[in-house]
C-alpha cells in the first residue's frame, strides 16, 4: 500500500514554498545535483537509436527512455520499480525523470563564468579591483598575474607579459608565484578576506574627496557586502564542474529520412566535452606548455559559448551560419523561457473562429457554433452520458459523440445551460478584452457577438476572430459569472463612464427616431398615452417625427397626470424606459452623448439589472428604426456652399498682400509663412462654417404656410450630428475644402487643397494628399508596436500595486483645482474630484461648519453640493501621498471606477492603471491617418476675449503704462482671472510678455470684451523707461546686418548668430541701452539696475541708434519658429518621455534659490547669471549664449521659477518644488496628450504610475543604518530599517525622493523574477545571484510564474490566510503549517469576496 501512496505522492503537488532564492552554486552543490558524469560527446547510436553510455543522453545517468523499462530490456513493468539493472546500469523509473535529472562534466582546468566576467560592471573585476581588459588577458592566456609575490618587490594582482615574467624568474627564481588562466584568478579570489576588505573600505570612505573614487569605493563595498551577507564565495564565480541540463530539455528528435533535429545546446555541450577530453589527454601526456595553454583557452571559449554565445568574441555558428542558441538565449527575450512559457501559456479547452454580429442576442449571451461547443465541452458530455447510463464506459461515450447521435445534442444543451464561457479578442489591451457570456447554440461556424460589447473589445465584423475558453472548475465558473460576465462590466475601468454604449447604426436609429419635423402628418394632436400614439403611428395616421402632446404621469413623486409635448418617436422610446426614469431624459434628440448620459444615470439610479435590460432594448429599437429610416450616402448629400469660391478668392488676395509685404521687407520669411498658414486655417474654418450651415438646416413650409428653417434630414449630416460615424472635419473634406496638408517632415505645406472630394482633386492636389495618407499607414504600424511596448513597461512597473488596507491614516493629499487652459475650463472641479476621498475639511466663506468632512467619499450628490457652493479647490487623498508600505489603501485610491463604490481590498489597481493608460495609446496610434494627414493646427491665439461678466484681477504681472494709456506686460508668469460677484474664480488666462492690456486691475468687464492682445509670431523686447537708444556692440557687418529691401528702401537691423560671426565679433555681446540726452545711464524704476537689453540671435531692431523711445515701446522683436502640426505622433512618444522621466533636450533652467538676478562676467559661449539670496549668499548658473533668457537684470525670482525658456525637466520640478508639483505636472501633461484625442482617463491611474516612479529614496544621511550616503533604496526598505533602528534607540536614515523612469523603476524592483522577465535578463540574474537575493513573491508576475493564485482579487484572501498560517506556525510551531487549501476553502473565500463586491448594489 505504501508503494502506491508513494506513486501518488510523486504525481502530486511539489512541496509548498514561500520565497525563491537565487545564489551562486558551489562545485559541491553542482556535484550533489548530478546523477553521474558525462564523459563522452556521443549522443545516440544512429543504428539502434539507443543512447550511448556515458554520453550526453546516457540512460544510466539520466534515467530510462521508456517508462519502467531498462535499456537492454532485461527488466520491464511496474513491479521492478526502483531496481537498477546489473547489465546496463539503468534504474527503472518513469521516463519523465529525464526532464529533471542533471549530469555534470568535471573540467580538467577551471573556467571563469562569463556572466560574472563580462556582465557590466564585471563582478570579478570589481572584487579584484582589476580592469576587465586585464582579467581577460589573464584568462585567455595572454599575460601572467602575480598570485603570491612572496618576499619580492612585485605586487599581488600585477600583470606580467612573457618577457617581464622571464625577467622576474631570472631575478627572483621561485620566490614568487605568477600564473595565467582561470586558476590564477580563482586563487586571487580565494585570497580575498571579505570582512577585512569591507572594514578597510568603510574606513577609507569618509577620508576621500574625489567623486569618482567615492563612486568606485561605494560600488565595490556594495558588492563585497553582498557576497559577505549572502554566504556566496567569490571563487565560485570560477567553475571546476559544469552542470549538464537534463536531456529531455535539449531533445534530439529523429526526422524522416534518417536525419535528426537537435537542440543547439547539444552541439555546445559536445564542443565542451571534446575539448575537455583532449585537454585531459594532453595533461596526461605532459604536453608542451604552449599546447596545453591553447587547449585551456579553447575550453574557456567553448564554456563561454555554452553559457552565453556571442557575449565575447564572435558567436559560434552551426552548419547554416546562424549563431547557436546558448543557455542565456534560452531564457531571455520574447521567445525566452520567461515570457514565452512562464508568463504566457497555451491553454486547453479553447477554440477560435470568426465573429459575426448577433443583433438578437441579449447582453449576457453569445452565439456558439454547435461543432465548437461539442468539442469544447467533451469531458462534460462524456461524464453526463455515463452518469445517465447511456454509455457504459468513457470509450463508448466517445464513440457516441463521434457519431453525433441525437441524444448527444440533448445532453450538450443540458451541459451548456448556465455554464459561462470566456470570449477573448487579441490584442487584449485591457481587462474588458476578456469577458464571460452564456453560450447559445447556433448553426454555422461563426461565433455571434453582441453588438454592444464591441466597443470594449474594439471589435468589428470585417473578419475579426475571437477565442473561446471554458472555465472548468466550479470556482472558475463562479468567478466568470460574478466578475467577468459582460453584464457586470458596464462601466469602463479607465474613466468610470459607461462602455456598453450604442454606436453606429443603433445611434443613427435612435437619433432618427427622436428627431422633430415641422409640419409632419398629425402635428399638434393629443393622445391619452404613449401606447395610443404608437397604435395611430402603426396604422399610418401619424408621421414618426410629428410633434404631438401626450398625457403622462407626473414625475418627482407627484401624483396625477400632465400633458407633455413630444414626438411620436420619443413616445415609442418611452415604452422601453425603466419604471421611474424621468421622461424628459429622452424627450430630446438622442445623440451618442445623450444616450451615454442616460445609460449612466440609469446605472446610478436603478443599478445593474435595469441598465442591462434598458441597454438591450435601446439596441433592438435602434436597429429597427435605422432600418426603417433608409438613411444612405449619396453624392447629392454632399452640399457645397454657394459662397465657397468668394471666400477662397478673398483668402488668395490676402495671401498676395502678405507676399508683397514680404517682398518689401516688412515681414520676415518666417512671419510670412506663419501668417499664410493662419489665413488658410481661418479660410478653411469659414468654408466649413458656411457648409455646415447649408448641410445642417433646410427650408420647409410650416402648417401656416410660412417658410421656416429646421435641422436637416441630410443623411451625412445626421450621421455626424448623432455621433454615429464621421465628424465635421470629415464632412468638411467631402463638401467644404480639404485644407492644409502636412509634409512628410510634419511641417505644413503652405499651398492648401481648395477642392473637396465631391468636386475631386487635380493631380497636384492628389499628390499632396498622398503624403498624409502614406505617413498615416507607416505611423500606424510603428506606433502600434510603440504603444504595446509602453503598455508593457507600465504593467511591469505597476504590477504589484494592490489595495492592501482600508485606510493608511494619512491626512495629506494633493490640491485639486479646475483645469483651465487658454481661459476655457477644460475639466471642471466636480469631474476631477468625483470618486475621491476628501483629505481635509472643506469650508466655504459664509459658513463656520465644514461643507464636507475629511474622509468623505465624494459621489455624484456630494460633487453637486460642491458645485452649488462654488468651491474652487479641494484637498483630496491620492495614491501619491498614500502611506501604505506594500500596496495602497482604499481611502487614498477612492472609488473603483468600474463598480462605482469604494474600492475593495485586493483590487489590482496597478494593472488597471497600466491598462487604462496603455489601451488608448494603441487606439491613438491608429488615429492619425483617418483625416488623411489634414493639418489640424489651431490658429495662433493673439488675444484674450472673456466669456463671463465679472471683475478682472491681475496676478503677479509687472506692467508699464504706454503713452496711449494702455498697460504693457513686462513679466512672464503673469495671469489674469475673472471673478464673479461672490469672489469665485470663473476664468483664468496666462498673459505673455509684451501683451497690451486694455483693462485696469479690479475694473468690471463684460462678456465678449477683449482685454489683452499680442503678436503671436514674435517675442517683443519692451522698454520700461523712456530715453534715447544707444547701441552697444552693434557693429554693422560684424554683429548685425542691415537688410535693405531694393523695392522699398526700408532697412532692418538683424543680429547675426555668434557661430557665423568673424573672429572680431565672436565675443561681442550686442545690446541696446537707454540713456539721457547727455549719455548717462537710465536706471529701472526703484533699482540701481541700468535699463539695458541684450539682443539674442535673429532679433530685429525697430529703432535706429540715438532715436527717442517711449515707455512700453517695442525696441526689438524676435521671430518665433514655425509651428509643427500637433497630432498624436507627438503624443505617444510624449507620454513615453514623461513616464520614462527623460531629461528634455535644452531643458528650461529653473531658479535654484529665490533672490535678485544679475549678470556676472561671461565665459566663452556662456553667460553667468547670479541669483543673490542675501548679502553673503548667492547661486551661480552658466547658461549658453544662444538660449533665450527670460529674466532681466534686477528682477526678483522665486525658487523653481523659469530663468531660461525650454521644456521643463521633471527632476528639477521634484527637487525644487516637491512631490505635489511634480505629480501635477506629469498628470496634466499626460492628460493633455489624451485630451487632444478626446480620450478620457481618470487622473488616479496616472497617479498610481507616478507613485511607482517615486518608490526610491536617495540616502542623504545614513545615521546608524546599513545604507551608504548617495545610495538609492526602496522607501519601504528605508522605513523598515528605520523602524528597527528606532526600536534599538539608534539614529535613523533620511532620504529625499528621487524620480525614476518606468523602465528603471521596473528593473529596480525588489523582486528579481519580475525584473528578469522584463528586460536585461542576464544583468538582473547576475546581480541577484551574487547578492543571494530572495524573492518574497509579493507581486502578481512572480506568482503567475510559479503557477500560484495571484495575490489580488479573489486570490488575495488565499494569500492572506497562508500568511496568517505561516505566522501561527512560526509562533507556536503549528504542525499544520503546510496545510493545503481545499476547494471548499477557496469557495468560501470566494463567496465572501463576492458578497463584499455586491453589498453596495
From Swiss-Prot:
Mg(2+) binds at residues 460, 462, 464. It is an enzyme of class 2 (transferase). It comes from the Bacteria. SMART domains: RPOLA_N. Its EC number is 2.7.7.6. It catalyses: RNA(n) + a ribonucleoside 5'-triphosphate = RNA(n+1) + diphosphate. Keywords: DNA-directed RNA polymerase, Magnesium, Metal-binding, Nucleotidyltransferase, Transcription, Transferase, Zinc. The keyword Cell inner membrane does not apply. Binds 1 Mg(2+) ion per subunit. Binds 2 Zn(2+) ions per subunit. One of its GO terms (molecular function) is zinc ion binding. One of its GO terms (biological process) is DNA-templated transcription. GO terms for cellular component: DNA-directed RNA polymerase complex. SUPFAM superfamilies: beta and beta-prime subunits of DNA dependent RNA-polymerase. Zn(2+) 2 binds at residues 808, 882, 889, 892. Its cofactor is Mg(2+); Zn(2+). Zn(2+) 1 binds at residues 70, 72, 85, 88. DNA-dependent RNA polymerase catalyzes the transcription of DNA into RNA using the four ribonucleoside triphosphates as substrates. Belongs to the RNA polymerase beta' chain family. The RNAP catalytic core consists of 2 alpha, 1 beta, 1 beta' and 1 omega subunit. When a sigma factor is associated with the core the holoenzyme is formed, which can initiate transcription. This is DNA-directed RNA polymerase subunit beta'. It comes from Legionella pneumophila (strain Paris). The lineage of its organism: Bacteria, Pseudomonadati, Pseudomonadota, Gammaproteobacteria, Legionellales.
Amino acid at each position: 500500500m505504501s508503494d502506491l501512496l508513494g506513486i501518488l505522492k510523486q504525481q502530486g503537488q511539489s512541496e509548498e514554498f514561500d520565497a525563491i532564492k537565487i545564489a551562486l552554486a558551489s562545485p559541491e552543490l553542482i556535484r550533489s545535483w548530478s546523477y553521474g558524469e558525462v564523459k563522452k560527446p556521443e549522443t545516440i547510436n544512429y543504428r539502434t537509436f539507443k543512447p550511448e553510455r556515458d554520453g550526453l543522453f546516457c540512460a544510466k545517468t539520466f534515467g530510462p527512455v521508456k517508462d519502467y523499462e531498462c535499456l537492454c530490456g532485461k527488466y520491464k513493468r511496474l513491479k521492478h520499480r526502483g531496481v537498477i539493472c546489473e547489465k546496463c546500469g539503468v534504474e527503472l523509473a518513469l521516463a519523465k525523470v529525464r526532464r529533471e535529472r542533471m549530469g555534470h562534466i568535471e573540467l580538467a582546468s577551471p573556467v571563469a563564468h562569463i556572466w560574472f566576467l563580462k556582465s557590466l560592471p564585471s563582478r570579478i573585476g570589481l572584487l579584484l579591483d582589476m580592469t576587465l581588459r586585464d582579467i581577460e588577458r589573464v584568462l585567455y592566456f595572454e599575460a601572467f598575474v602575480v598570485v603570491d609575490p612572496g618576499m619580492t618587490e612585485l605586487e599581488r594582482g600585477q600583470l606580467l607579459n612573457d618577457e617581464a615574467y622571464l625577467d622576474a624568474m631570472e631575478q627572483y627564481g621561485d620566490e614568487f608565484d605568477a600564473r595565467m588562466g582561470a586558476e590564477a584568478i580563482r586563487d586571487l579570489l580565494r585570497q580575498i578576506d571579505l570582512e577585512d576588505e569591507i572594514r578597510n573600505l568603510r574606513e577609507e570612505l569618509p577620508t576621500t574627496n574625489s567623486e569618482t573614487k567615492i563612486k568606485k569605493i561605494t560600488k565595490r563595498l556594495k558588492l563585497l557586502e553582498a557576497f559577505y551577507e549572502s554566504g556566496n564565495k567569490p571563487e565560485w564565480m570560477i567553475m571546476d564542474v559544469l552542470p549538464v541540463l537534463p536531456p529531455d530539455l535539449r531533445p534530439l528528435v529523429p526526422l524522416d529520412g534518417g536525419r535528426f533535429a537537435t537542440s543547439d545546446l547539444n552541439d555546445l555541450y559536445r564542443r565542451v566535452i571534446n575539448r575537455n577530453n583532449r585537454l585531459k589527454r594532453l595533461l596526461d601526456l605532459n604536453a608542451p606548455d604552449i599546447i596545453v595553454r591553447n587547449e585551456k583557452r579553447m575550453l574557456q571559449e567553448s564554456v563561454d559559448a555554452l553559457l552565453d554565445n556571442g557575449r565575447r568574441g564572435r558567436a559560434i555558428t552551426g552548419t547554416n551560419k546562424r549563431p547557436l542558441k546558448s543557455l542565456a538565449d534560452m531564457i531571455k527575450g520574447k521567445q525566452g523561457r520567461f515570457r514565452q512559457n512562464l508568463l504566457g501559456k497555451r491553454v486547453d479547452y479553447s477554440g477560435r473562429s470568426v465573429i459575426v454580429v448577433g443583433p438578437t442576442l441579449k447582453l449576457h449571451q453569445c452565439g456558439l457554433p454547435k461543432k465548437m461547443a461539442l468539442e469544447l465541452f467533451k469531458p462534460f458530455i462524456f461524464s453526463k452520458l455515463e452518469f445517465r447510463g447511456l454509455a457504459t464506459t468513457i470509450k463508448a461515450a466517445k464513440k457516441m459523440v463521434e457519431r453525433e447521435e441525437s441524444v448527444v445534442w440533448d445532453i450538450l444543451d443540458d451541459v451548456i445551460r448556465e455554464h459561462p464561457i470566456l470570449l477573448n479578442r487579441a490584442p487584449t489591451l485591457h481587462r474588458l478584452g476578456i469577458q464571460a457570456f452564456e453560450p447559445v447554440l447556433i448553426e454555422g461556424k461563426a461565433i455571434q457577438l453582441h453588438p454592444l460589447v464591441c466597443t470594449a473589445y474594439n471589435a468589428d465584423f470585417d473578419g475579426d476572430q475571437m477565442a473561446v475558453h471554458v472555465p472548468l472548475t466550479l470556482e472558475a465558473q463562479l468567478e466568470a459569472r460574478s466578475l467577468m460576465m459582460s453584464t457586470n462590466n458596464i462601466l469602463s475601468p479607465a474613466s468610470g463612464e459607461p462602455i456598453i454604449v450604442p454606436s453606429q447604426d443603433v445611434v443613427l436609429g435612435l437619433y432618427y427616431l427622436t428627431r422633430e419635423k415641422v409640419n409632419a402628418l398629425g402635428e399638434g394632436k393629443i393622445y391619452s398615452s404613449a401606447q395610443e400614439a404608437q397604435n395611430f403611428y402603426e396604422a399610418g395616421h401619424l408621421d414618426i417625427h410629428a410633434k404631438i402632446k401626450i398625457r403622462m404621469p407626473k414625475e418627482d413623486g407627484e401624483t396625477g397626470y400632465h400633458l407633455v409635448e413630444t414626438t411620436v418617436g420619443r413616445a415609442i422610446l418611452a415604452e422601453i424606459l425603466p419604471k421611474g426614469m424621468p421622461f424628459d431624459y429622452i424627450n430630446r434628440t438622442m445623440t451618442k452623448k445623450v444616450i451615454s448620459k442616460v445609460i449612466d444615470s440609469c446605472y446610478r439610479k436603478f443599478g445593474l439589472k435595469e441598465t442591462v435590460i434598458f441597454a438591450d432594448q435601446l439596441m433592438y429599437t435602434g436597429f429597427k428604426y435605422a432600418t426603417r429610416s433608409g438613411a444612405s450616402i449619396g453624392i447629392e448629400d454632399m452640399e457645397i456652399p454657394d459662397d465657397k469660391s468668394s471666400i477662397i478668392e478673398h483668402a488668395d488676395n490676402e495671401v498676395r498682400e502678405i507676399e508683397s509685404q514680404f517682398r518689401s521687407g516688412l515681414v520676415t520669411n518666417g512671419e510670412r509663412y506663419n501668417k499664410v498658414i493662419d489665413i488658410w486655417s481661418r479660410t478653411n474654418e469659414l468654408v466649413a462654417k458656411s457648409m455646415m450651415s447649408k448641410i445642417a438646416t433646410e427650408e420647409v413650409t410650416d402648417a401656416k404656410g410660412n417658410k421656416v428653417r429646421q435641422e436637416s434630414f441630410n443623411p451625412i449630416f445626421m450621421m455626424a450630428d448623432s455621433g454615429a460615424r464621421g465628424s465635421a472635419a470629415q464632412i468638411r473634406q467631402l463638401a467644404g475644402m480639404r485644407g492644409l496638408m502636412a509634409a512628410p517632415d510634419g511641417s505644413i505645406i503652405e499651398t492648401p487643397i481648395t477642392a473637396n472630394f465631391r468636386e475631386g482633386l487635380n493631380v497636384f492636389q492628389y499628390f499632396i494628399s498622398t503624403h498624409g495618407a502614406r505617413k498615416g499607414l507607416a505611423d500606424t504600424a510603428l506606433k502600434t508596436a510603440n504603444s504595446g511596448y509602453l503598455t508593457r513597461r507600465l504593467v511591469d512597473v505597476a504590477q504589484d500595486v494592490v489595495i492592501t488596507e482600508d485606510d493608511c491614516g494619512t491626512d495629506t493629499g494633493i490640491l485639486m483645482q479646475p483645469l483651465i487652459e487658454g481661459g476655457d475650463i477644460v475639466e471642471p472641479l466636480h469631474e476631477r474630484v468625483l470618486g475621491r476621498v476628501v483629505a481635509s475639511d472643506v469650508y466655504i466663506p459664509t459658513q463656520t461648519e465644514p461643507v464636507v468632512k475629511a474622509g468623505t467619499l465624494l459621489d455624484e450628490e456630494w460633487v453637486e453640493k460642491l458645485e452649488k457652493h462654488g468651491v474652487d479647490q479641494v484637498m483630496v487623498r491620492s495614491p501619491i501621498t498614500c502611506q501604505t508600505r506594500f500596496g495602497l489603501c482604499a481611502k487614498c485610491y477612492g472609488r473603483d471606477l468600474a463598480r462605482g463604490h469604494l474600492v475593495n481590498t485586493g483590487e489590482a489597481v496597478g494593472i488597471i492603471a497600466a491598462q487604462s493608460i496603455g489601451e488608448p495609446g494603441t487606439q491613438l496610434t491608429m488615429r492619425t491617418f483617418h483625416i488623411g494627414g489634414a493639418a489640424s493646427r489651431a490658429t495662433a491665439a493673439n488675444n484674450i476675449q472673456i466669456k463671463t461678466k465679472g471683475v478682472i484681477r491681475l496676478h503677479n504681472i509687472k506692467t508699464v503704462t504706454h503713452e496711449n494709456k494702455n498697460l504693457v506686460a513686462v513679466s512672464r508668469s503673469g495671469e489674469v482671472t475673472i471673478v464673479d460677484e461672490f469672489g469665485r474664480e470663473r476664468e483664468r488666462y496666462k498673459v505673455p510678455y509684451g501683451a497690451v492690456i486694455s483693462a485696469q486691475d479690479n475694473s468690471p468687464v463684460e462678456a465678449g470684451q477683449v482685454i489683452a492682445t499680442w503678436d503671436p509670431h514674435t517675442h517683443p523686447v519692451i522698454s520700461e523707461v523712456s530715453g534715447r537708444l544707444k547701441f552697444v556692440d552693434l557693429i554693422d557687418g560684424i554683429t548685425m546686418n542691415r537688410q535693405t529691401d531694393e523695392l522699398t528702401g526700408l532697412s532692418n537691423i538683424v543680429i547675426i548668430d555668434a557661430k557665423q560671426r568673424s573672429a572680431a565679433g565672436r565675443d561681442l555681446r550686442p545690446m541696446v541701452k537707454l540713456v539721457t540726452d547727455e549719455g548717462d545711464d537710465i536706471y529701472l524704476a526703484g533699482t540701481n539696475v541700468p535699463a539695458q537689453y541684450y539682443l539674442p540671435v535673429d532679433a530685429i531692431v525697430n529703432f535706429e541708434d540715438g532715436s527717442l523711445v517711449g515707455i512700453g515701446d517695442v525696441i526689438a522683436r524676435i521671430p518665433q519658429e514655425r509651428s509643427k502640426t500637433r497630432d498624436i505622433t507627438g503624443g505617444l512618444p510624449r507620454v513615453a518621455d514623461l513616464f520614462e522621466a527623460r531629461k528634455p533636450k535644452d531643458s528650461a533652467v529653473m531658479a535654484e534659490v529665490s533672490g535678485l538676478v544679475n549678470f556676472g562676467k561671461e565665459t566663452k559661449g556662456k553667460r553667468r547669471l547670479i541669483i543673490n539670496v542675501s548679502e553673503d549668499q548667492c547661486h551661480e548658473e552658466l547658461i549658453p549664449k544662444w538660449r533665450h533668457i527670460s529674466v532681466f537684470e534686477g528682477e526678483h525670482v522665486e525658487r523653481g521659477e523659469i530663468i531660461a525658456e525650454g521644456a521643463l525637466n521633471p527632476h528639477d520640478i521634484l527637487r525644487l518644488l516637491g512631490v505635489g508639483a511634480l505629480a501635477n505636472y506629469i498628470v496634466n501633461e499626460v492628460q493633455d496628450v489624451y485630451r487632444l484625442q478626446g480620450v478620457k482617463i481618470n487622473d488616479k491611474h496616472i497617479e498610481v504610475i507616478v507613485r511607482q516612479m517615486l518608490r526610491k529614496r536617495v540616502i542623504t544621511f545614513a545615521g546608524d543604518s546599513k545604507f551608504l550616503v548617495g545610495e538609492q533604496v526602496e522607501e519601504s526598505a528605508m522605513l523598515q530599517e528605520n523602524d528597527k533602528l528606532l526600536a534599538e534607540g539608534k539614529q535613523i536614515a533620511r532620504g529625499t525622493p528621487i524620480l525614476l523612469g518606468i523602465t528603471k523603476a521596473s528593473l529596480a524592483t525588489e523582486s528579481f523574477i519580475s525584473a528578469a522577465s522584463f528586460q536585461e535578463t542576464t544583468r538582473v540574474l547576475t546581480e541577484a545571484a551574487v547578492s543571494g537575493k530572495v524573492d518574497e513573491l509579493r507581486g502578481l508576475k512572480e506568482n503567475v510564474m510559479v503557477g500560484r493564485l495571484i495575490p489580488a482579487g479573489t486570490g488575495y484572501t488565499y494569500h492572506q490566510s497562508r500568511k496568517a498560517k505561516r505566522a501561527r506556525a512560526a509562533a507556536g510551531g503549528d504542525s499544520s503549517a503546510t496545510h493545503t487549501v481545499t476547494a471548499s476553502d477557496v469557495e468560501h473565500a470566494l463567496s465572501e469576496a463576492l458578497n463584499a463586491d455586491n453589498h453596495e448594489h
